[in-house]
Design a protein with these regions (language model features):
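PLP-dependent amino-acid enzyme catalytic core
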Residues: 1-309
Length: 309
């Protein structure tokens, strides 16, 4: 039977779930270690789901009108997703991003036709959010998607990511591991999975150099895509059972190992989630468990960073 898609939006979601068999063997794991490969979304990251959900919600509620300008503060991937989806729908797109993010992310957004406004990296996402709000005040009829505050962010994962994981594992999942940037992935996916089975453990990953959730301290770090140095409104802190701090070196090492062991090139935050999942899988009490880590994006957008040096 033929299967022909008529828009890139139809390609979002239903990403593959893969067992890391070689990694399991090398580390003598007694647990199954699975990864959700979000780089298979058309925009190359998990944030395609969020972009689509926020735009659909805004259009349905009548707050996003034809010909309007979509503005978004983002560390990169949401900007790429919005640039692709909103641009294809005919909206003007302005992305506000810290200048510390990779050049690949900047070029990708421009490639999709978005306008890019850079803010000082030292101010993190807080600086980008402030600038986006300034732009909204100066551009009539503009819409700030607001992924850090927008319930449609977490809803995307509640409606898609969670159900996909539950179906693909046939309900046999013991732990879910994901990094926290906006908190949408952990909140939406975690809620859905715990509704199916309250015993499922949700592990939140944050930068060790900015342990805001675990220790109340924020600071600069090198884990692009997570650790926004604020507690987003989207994040439900009651969903996760444990916080796993990961260093930049640990994230890099995990991503490099995955490329050379499994042939999968993933990004920095994916390396962080993988490291946390691997450490969980090594615990004696994880024997026989199925652990799933969500890997947000492809490593190709980090080739200008030291990730694969």
């Amino acid at each position: 039977m033929s299967q022909i898609y008529t828009s890139a939006e139809q390609l979002i979601g239903h990403t593959p779930l893969m067992e890391l068999c070689r990694t399991e063997q090398q580390n003598h794991l007694a647990a199954r270690l699975l990864v959700k490969l979000e780089c298979f979304n058309p925009g190359g990251s998990v944030k395609d789901r969020v972009a689509l959900s926020m735009l659909d919600d805004a259009e349905e509620r009548g707050i996003l009108k034809p010909g309007a300008t979509v503005i978004e503060p983002t560390s990169g991937n949401t900007g790429i997703g919005l640039a692709a989806v909103a641009g294809a729908r005919g909206y003007r797109v302005i992305i506000v991003m810290p200048d510390s993010m990779s050049m690949e992310r900047q070029k990708l957004m421009r490639g999709y036709g978005a306008e890019l406004v850079l803010t000082p990296g030292a101010k993190g996402m807080t600086g980008a959010v402030e600038k986006a709000n300034e732009l909204q005040q100066s551009i009539p009829g503009s819409f700030v998607a607001g992924q850090f505050d927008n319930p449609a962010n977490a809803l995307a994962h509640y409606r898609t990511t969670g159900p996909e994981l539950w179906a693909d594992t046939d309900g046999k999942i013991d732990a879910f591991v994901a990094g926290i940037g906006t908190g949408g992935t952990v909140t939406g996916t975690g809620r859905y999975l715990k509704e199916q089975n309250p015993a499922i453990r949700v592990i939140a990953v944050e930068p060790a150099a900015s342990p805001l959730l675990s220790q109340g301290k924020a600071g600069p770090h090198g884990l692009q895509g997570i650790g926004a140095n604020c507690v987003p409104k989207v994040l439900d802190t009651g969903v996760y059972d444990e916080i796993s701090p990961v260093t930049e070196e640990q994230a890099y090492a995990a991503a490099r190992s995955l490329a050379r062991t499994e042939g999968l090139l993933v990004g920095i935050s994916a390396g962080a989630a993988l490291h946390a999942a691997l450490e969980l899988a090594k615990r004696p009490d994880s024997a026989g468990n199925t652990i799933v880590a969500l890997l947000p994006d492809t490593g190709e957008r980090y080739l200008s960073t030291p990730l694969f040096d």
